Amino acid sequence: MATEIFSDVVKSVWSHATAKHAHLRMAVQVDNRSRLLSDLVYQLEKRLSEETHLDDETYALYESQTGLLEDHMALVRKCAAQLDNSNTIDHRTPLDPECVFLFEMICPGVRYGKTLNSLWSKYAAQWPEKLIRQELDMVKPLSFKDEVAKYMEKMQEKTRKNRMTQKVINEMRIAHQKGWFFVFDTLTLADDRLQAFNENPNALRDYFRTVGRAVLRAEGRSVKDSYNDCYRYLCVPEFGGQHGRLHWHVVHMVRTLPLGSHDPNFGRPVRNYRQINSFRGMWPYGFTQPIAVRYQHDAYSRKGWLWPVDKSGKAMQSKPYQAVAWYVTKYVAKQSDQRQKAITERQKKCKNPLMAICLKKEFRVRSSRKLGMELPSMAHLSNKVLLELSRISFDSSPLYQIVKENAKKQLTLNIGALPLHVILDVRPEVRSMLKAIRRLMKKTPEFNWQSSIASMTVTLKNGDISDEARQYIIDAGITPTDLRAKATQTFGGK
């Protein structure tokens, strides 16, 4: 690998690599903790030297704080001494008796694994920087949220929303190609079941387990099996506009419909039913309305289900699955916008005290594990092509964030066999984007948010990437043309 490309690869996947590879993560955290403790020792000595009157109580406190820092420094130094820079970054270091002794003294009663890496992870979790500062009475003051910080929060929220949107589209694309069934459901909370819902923190988890096990039974499998290969879901919370009442919109993607599922329009003179009764009764806290999602060439048509009509008797408009996917994502965008609203505003609209208790909780978008992250393997691609894919923009694919994450994961695996010292030699400097933007605002009279942030990140247009990278996107079927909702026609129904 060329030196320039190698350096760019490490910079591109640094956060992924430190999260994935235990040896590298520990080396970085040990170095950061050593710097922190040295700085705290300096501040403690400086504070002591500035004391005009040193009584016994103050001196005893200083001795206690100094002893705490010395214990932590001893563990950090011992762990640093055990790190082998010539070993690979995915190496697992065996336990050292002295490290175990120091750990048990600092973290009494805390369990740890069989490697030094797991012991260090437990220590870092038990003693974060904030807790150490609290013990030393050196808590950092909360920073004031200026215009830059508020804008960055909005940008992060927008990025999360776009990422979830792309994951939903990709998951529905994959499910459509596999011939799965889509069911759209709305979960509500009945007044007489609010207390039971409030008392069960795992109500939603239990509901999705019930649906997953129903799919397993329909396939003749044990309910103890994992249903991740035959059932996927997305659940988006929403608060009603008039009374702020909590409910959820759910998209079920199933390989096999639960037992008892049949065409609701079979034998009916007017085919205007779409509810699937086999999904009802699984949510014990209110009402549900499970509806078959019909679109061009869907699994229901291949199963022989009749095409539904509207109230006037006309065949319902048939759209491609892409249009259905984009429709579902609007709920994700709406939930993201509602998160910005204050909880007190919702409670003012709510008359029921039990519902007001629900509104105090923060409900997030729930989904199956690794929803929408599946793409064709990138193991055959070169590091240069992977680096290009890790920098693509919307021009190349509407699923650009999914492609970038998969490319970075593959790059992270590719560098896993390299020695630790080789990676640390090209360790990128971690810069604060907040500080960088603030400096730009001072230097630039006519400051532009988008152009400034774009200048700090490397992105490639479709014309900037190689033919091999472009061919991967085409073969994966995730080009803008592939994911564009085309002209609506009536297809696939009887």
Swiss-Prot record:
The keyword Nuclease applies. One of its GO terms (molecular function) is zinc ion binding. The active site is at 327 (o-(5'-phospho-dna)-tyrosine intermediate), 331 (o-(5'-phospho-dna)-tyrosine intermediate). InterPro entries: Replication_gene_A-like. GO terms for biological process: DNA replication; viral DNA genome replication. Keywords: DNA replication, DNA-binding, Endonuclease, Hydrolase, Metal-binding, Nuclease, Viral DNA replication, Zinc, Zinc-finger. A zinc finger (unnamed) spans 230-252. Pfam families: Phage_GPA. Disulfide bonds: none annotated. The A protein is a specific endonuclease that cleaves the viral strand of supertwisted, closed circular DNA at a unique site in the A gene. The A protein also causes relaxation of supertwisted DNA and forms a complex with viral DNA that has a discontinuity in gene A of the viral strand. Phi KhT, a host-range mutant of phi K, can grow on E.coli C and B, besides K12, and is more thermosensitive than the parental phage phi K. This is A protein. The lineage of its organism: Viruses, Monodnaviria, Sangervirae, Phixviricota, Malgrandaviricetes. The gene is A.
